[in-house]
């Protein structure tokens, strides 16, 4: 059974693309699974964080079409999670990922710190996003990790 929680997330991201005219945001989030050697590096929660932050920064759009996008800030997220994710109360994560999409590449640097807050704080936040009402968008499954030189 899923539980809802409210999290205050402080974040920084730097995303650049080369030879990619545009992709769904979930493609970028799915690409976070890969490090340079093709190993799995992230949990689903970080994908939810980055996807929500990008959708909020892009005013609800589920599509990324920039050569480079850099931002940092804070956002309150309302999420639903399974009881197996007992580490969602607070934490931090930092990772980098480079991956191919078609003939182009996307590079992502993402850092986040999160803390569980009350619903009252979430409701009073100017910058908030409700992930429980956000439908999934198309995910490209044919991604290859970019090999380190």
From Swiss-Prot:
Source organism's superkingdom? Viruses
The similarity comment for this entry is: Belongs to the tibrovirus protein U2 family.
The protein's name is: Protein U2
Q: Which gene encodes it?
A: U2
């Amino acid at each position: 059974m899923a539980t809802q929680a409210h999290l205050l997330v402080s974040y920084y991201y730097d995303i650049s693309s080369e030879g990619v005219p545009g992709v769904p945001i979930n493609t970028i989030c799915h690409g976070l699974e890969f490090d340079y050697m093709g190993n799995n590096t992230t949990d689903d929660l970080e994908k939810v964080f980055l996807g929500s932050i990008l959708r909020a920064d892009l005013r609800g759009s589920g599509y990324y079409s920039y050569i480079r996008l850099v931002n940092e800030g804070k956002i309150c997220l309302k999420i639903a999670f399974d009881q197996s994710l007992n580490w969602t109360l607070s934490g931090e994560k930092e990772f980098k990922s480079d991956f191919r999409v078609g003939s182009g590449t996307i590079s992502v640097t993402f850092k986040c710190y999160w803390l569980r807050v009350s619903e009252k704080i979430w409701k009073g936040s100017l910058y908030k996003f409700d992930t429980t009402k956000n439908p999934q968008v198309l995910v490209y499954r044919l991604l290859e990790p970019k090999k380190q030189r």
